[in-house]
Amino acid sequence: AGDAVWAVGHDGTILNSRDGGLTWVVQREDVLDTSPDAAFDPRQGVPLLDILMLDANHGFAVGADSQLLRTEDGGATWTFVSTTQAAASSPADDQASQTEEVGNDDSWTLSEDDLAMEDVSDPHFNAIARTGSGALLIVGERGVAFRSRDGGASWERIELPYGGSMFGVIGYEGDHAVAFGMRGNVYETFDLGESWSAIDTGTDLSL
């Protein structure tokens, strides 16, 4: 949107620059209130991990614990959006998953038990992208993915062939998109997630 850029981070922070990044203003932050009489809000203090602006006014931010926020005024205000299916089970729930967490020792070699997630009721949403057709895709941990064909008004859970975390997604022309994540896994779709094809990266490193 011209010289306007956005960035997201910890404590639900959203920053905006109107001059190409020379100066920034805080549009939103949601720092965890640790005072003794504070009401518990599980969304407080949760980091945001990606942001997608569709134009100068409309956009979405995604983050940990299935956070999905929407703005219609250039980021002046943000509201929570429910995918309604974020906690739904999927075939990936029956697989041993792979997460970013490491054990308490100094070893970087993890067993499948080490990589298994105990609670995936609110999986992290790691990235969001728009395809050339205008559809939106969200990817997250443990193979979680969602798509929207109506500009984010409604969301549909879709299946990825890999049950580990996906860290990014890129939208191309039409319904073409590429998702990438743990252990060098990259998958490509030409039909907005109806089917996926693996792309050999030649690496087991996370992407």
Regions picked out by a protein language model, each given a short descriptive name:
Residues A1-L207:
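Residue-level hotspots at or immediately adjacent to binding/recognition sites across diverse folds
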